[in-house]
């Protein structure tokens, strides 16, 4: 099961076995399930086994072997994928110990390079209200830490993608869209916000314009992607308003490369503005066009 080639055979072999033979085989490898789960190759057949468990006895053997080793698995590069498969393929009622561990250690897991894949998978599920509320309350309490963290920001992105009440989380960051757009990891989350909901896109545009420093986002290593996305997604009056304000700020960029870059970005949209628009006149005068 740890051979790069024979592990493929084992996966196919297990799928083809009848239930009695599966149970016999699982009992034979029961004491090696954890070791295999932590192995670069062995993790794959264990994931296949979990995916194709089809009766109570099979589940009981595997769950019994794994139950006391969740921390060891979930923080491991390979074991975390076994836990992810458990969450995807086994009913919550059969693995309450796993959900309890996640609830009690959510922040540590969300901020871990390996465990975050498990958390993302969990957030995509239709969680019961108890688990949903536990996670939601943790995120509300530590909202800033999550959005700025290299792993934790994926929690916010997953909530926005999969949860019905995603706006409750987005509104935690309202009035901070400008500053968050300048941050390496948070800027990705802000992009997700404005992609998800047109109301948030409009809030974002209003906020960055009100700041009077839209040029800071335009020249930001991270923020420039957010405002480009906003220009692409916005419509009608909001697009015109955003393009107008970006155009009149272009001379604040100073750097010639940035100015040329933003000229090419804004040009197609500038042409859509009214002929007597101050932004259009400023833009044309600045570039002598």
Segments from the language model and where they lie:
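Eukaryotic gene-expression regulator signature that favors modular helical reader/repeat domains
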Residues: 1-289
């Amino acid at each position: 099961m740890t051979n790069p080639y024979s592990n493929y055979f084992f996966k196919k072999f297990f799928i083809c076995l009848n239930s009695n033979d599966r149970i016999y085989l699982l009992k034979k490898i029961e004491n090696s399930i954890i070791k295999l789960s932590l192995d670069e190759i062995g993790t794959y057949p264990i994931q296949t086994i979990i995916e194709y468990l089809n009766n109570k006895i099979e589940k009981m053997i595997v769950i019994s072997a794994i139950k006391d080793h969740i921390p060891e698995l979930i923080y491991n590069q390979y074991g975390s994928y076994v836990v992810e498969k458990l969450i995807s393929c086994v009913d919550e009622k059969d693995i309450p110990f796993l959900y309890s561990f996640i609830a009690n250690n959510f922040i540590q897991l969300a901020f871990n390079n390996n465990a975050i894949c498990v958390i993302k998978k969990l957030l995509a599920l239709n969680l019961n209200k108890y688990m949903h509320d536990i996670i939601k309350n943790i995120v509300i309490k530590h909202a800033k830490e999550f959005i700025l963290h290299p792993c934790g920001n994926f929690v916010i992105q997953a909530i926005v993608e999969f949860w019905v009440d995603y706006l409750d989380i987005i509104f935690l960051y309202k009035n901070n869209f400008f500053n968050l757009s300048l941050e390496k990891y948070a800027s990705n989350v802000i992009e997700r916000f404005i992609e998800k909901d047109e109301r948030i896109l409009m809030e974002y545009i209003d906020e960055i314009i009100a700041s009077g420093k839209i040029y800071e986002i335009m020249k930001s290593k991270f923020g420039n992607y957010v405002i480009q996305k906003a220009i692409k997604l916005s419509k009608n009056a909001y697009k015109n308003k955003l393009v107008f304000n970006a155009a009149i700020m272009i001379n604040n960029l100073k750097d010639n490369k940035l100015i040329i870059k933003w000229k090419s970005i804004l040009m197609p949209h500038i042409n859509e503005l009214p002929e007597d628009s101050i932004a259009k006149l400023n833009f044309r005068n600045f570039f002598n066009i």
